[in-house]
Amino acid sequence: DAAGNLMGRLYPDNWNEKELHGVIATGSHIDTVRNGGKFDGLLGSIAGIEVAQCLKENHVKLKSPFEVILFTDEEGARFNAGMVGSKVIAGLGMERPLSEYTDNEGISEEAAMQKCGYHPEKLEEAVYADKYEKFVELHIEQGIVLEQESRQIGIVTGIKGPYWIEGSFEGEANHAGGTPMNMRKDAMTAAANYIAEVEKIASRLGDMFVATVGTLKVHPGGINTIPGRVDYTIDIRDTDMERRAQGIREIKEAAVKI
């Protein structure tokens, strides 16, 4: 579709292909995060295709259309957008225009999609959430709980909705050798203290609440220069939205205090 989602579909006998409703779907995403697991997304994608192949080879008579979806840009690892393909299908839209989501080289997601042959200007044509009756996804755990408990598979009871924060600590860049410790305004020291506070807040709010300071960018970034600014990102998640909101509030307040 216009967003780059890939779909394959099997129809029941004598089904009018123009009438899409009651679709049973499966699938997953085809992007991943760094060190996210080599089967992240791929497991559900390949499993869906395998199911479709088995249905066809065994001449299973379908009562409803069966669809395999490979979602694009689920993780948001490059542009910090995330869930782009599924949001388009569901008609939810993005918080900002795709032209405002950029990677580390300044390339926008809109430009990258166009380079791939997608059509970000026609995303509204890819909205068709109403046609689905059911959706199921096979996915790796991306954790160690099942492994530690020697369990092969588990059933998801909730998804930890992510909330991302981007912020900066401003200090004063100076020479590392000529500036006494008591006269420094070191942005990295502030960032380090903040990371420790984020860890404390997350640990106090319980096992389901997690917060991760995933990236730091130090400016100007010299071995012999006191950092003048540190940019950071935080990934905050919980299955309980009220508790997540509480954690977000406390984490933001901690930054102000520091």
Regions found by a protein language model. Give the residues of each.
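Acidic/His- and Gly-rich active-site-bordering loop/insert found
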Residues: 1-37, 55
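Beta-strand segments within the central parallel beta-sheet cores of soluble alpha/beta enzyme folds
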Residues: 3, 25, 61-72, 210-215
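Phosphate-handling active-site elements
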Residues: 18, 52-67, 97-102, 200-208
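Midchain, well-structured core segments that form catalytic/ion-binding scaffolds
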Residues: 31, 73-74, 78-241, 256
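FAD-binding core of FAD-dependent oxidoreductases
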Residues: 32-46, 78-82
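Short, solvent-exposed loop/turn segments at secondary-structure boundaries
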Residues: 37-40, 179-182, 246
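Short amphipathic alpha-helical face segments that pack within enzyme cores
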Residues: 42-50, 189-193
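Short amphipathic alpha-helices in soluble, non-transmembrane regions
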Residues: 246-256
